[in-house]
């Protein structure tokens, strides 16, 4: 099946796979047997972050299941949490196609999707239904603004989406760092970000996090850290996709959009280590270029409380979460580490 999907157009393959996973998710009893085979349940993997309990530190990054259609499947496949979105207050179709490209030679993707989603209201209905069914998977909700909303009114979009979705998420992420919505990254800059966080922080008692770009300078990252602390955010998600294109081999390398996957690995780890130096009181969620158990181990050791995957999962297939978590346990045993909290304190 994995090989068949790679023979299709990338967005068509994503739509087909997600549709099948959504059908599977709607049939709860059918999730139990594969979950017993695929999930790695071990108390050494448990994580407490921003007041939420996670069965393991490996999560599905935003973008894979924008509209919260396949939540049961992510649990059955072994993830410790899933982040839905990016969700905007109103539905939008996103950018023109083609807008998703596989860079197989680089184990990477380029996307310029443009926050295509069915809107916060429909996602809220799906999330409510999953909660009513007793889904045991912690869910993050990634929020954005509609493309046609001026930057000066961006906070209103984030507030509208947050109010619709607030009862159903375990934590919320403000996406101000996608390169595929014109002008959005300006919201990472001091005055815009200060105003945005001042509006959003009082609107929820749930954990609120900020997703940052990999292309920020150390000085800009320090400014983000300072504002996150000023407004009492619970954490940062680092990093989003990059505009950089150094060293790529694929013929798709010059396509516009955000690059994810293996080429982002070094920069994602560099940003994580920089943030960890000044992140007192903030939980860090690392994402970008995670492909192996050693990658997962390195992110946790560098200060991440949680780690997300997207492109690695696309290339690695349905057994990918299990392989990473079993490999992480082997590394913990080899190093004499009995819990992830102990690893981060090392």
UniProtKB/Swiss-Prot annotation:
Spell out the Pfam families in the cross-references.
DHO_dh
Gene Ontology cellular component terms for the protein in this record: cytoplasm; plasma membrane
Q: How does it sit in the membrane?
A: Peripheral membrane protein
Q: Which PROSITE patterns match?
A: DHODEHASE_1
> What's the Enzyme Commission number for this chain?
1.3.5.2
Q: Where is the active site?
A: 178
**Main subcellular location:** membrane
Q: Where in the cell does this protein reside? A: Cell membrane
Cofactor(s) recorded for this entry are: FMN
Checking CDD domains in the record gives: DHOD_2_like
> Does the entry feature the keyword Hydrolase, yes or no?
no
Q: Which residues bind FMN?
A: 62-66, 86, 142, 175, 211, 239, 261, 289, 310-311
Which controlled-vocabulary keywords does the entry list? Cell membrane, Flavoprotein, FMN, Membrane, Oxidoreductase, Pyrimidine biosynthesis
Q: What does this protein do?
A: Catalyzes the conversion of dihydroorotate to orotate with quinone as electron acceptor.
Which proteins does it associate with, and in what oligomeric form?
Answer: Monomer.
**What family is this protein classified in?**
Belongs to the dihydroorotate dehydrogenase family. Type 2 subfamily.
Q: What is this protein called?
A: Dihydroorotate dehydrogenase (quinone)
